[in-house]
Amino acid sequence: MNKIRKGDRVIVRTGKDKGKQGTVLAVLGEHVTVEGVNVAKKHVRPNPMLGTTGGVVDKVMPIHISNVALVDANGKPSRVGIKVENGVKTRVLKTTGAAVGA
């Protein structure tokens, strides 16, 4: 069971975007892409076959999953634990003890 999933609200703990919050767009193995975090400029060549124009495009790049933490209701970073009740695993915030997601 992954501790961080698509749609979770996270905060960046280290790096150039430290302190920024965003929503997880995708989980790619040990990397995640977070909305508005680690944005790079990519040069795109025009492709008349696809009807795309060339230019400089902002692209969200992945960051390592260890550099982000879930945000609790108070806006503080929190670690995630897994609790088993009646054979069902649920993710739980360590700071508040509240269940994460549905």
From Swiss-Prot:
InterPro entries: KOW (IPR005824), Rib_uL2_dom2 (IPR014722), Ribosomal_uL24 (IPR003256), Ribosomal_uL24_KOW (IPR041988), Translation_prot_SH3-like_sf (IPR008991). Pfam families: KOW, ribosomal_L24. The keyword rRNA-binding applies. It comes from the Bacteria. One of its GO terms (molecular function) is rRNA binding. Belongs to the universal ribosomal protein uL24 family. One of two assembly initiator proteins, it binds directly to the 5'-end of the 23S rRNA, where it nucleates assembly of the 50S subunit. One of the proteins that surrounds the polypeptide exit tunnel on the outside of the subunit. Part of the 50S ribosomal subunit. This is Large ribosomal subunit protein uL24. It comes from Ralstonia nicotianae (strain ATCC BAA-1114 / GMI1000). The lineage of its organism: Bacteria, Pseudomonadati, Pseudomonadota, Betaproteobacteria, Burkholderiales.
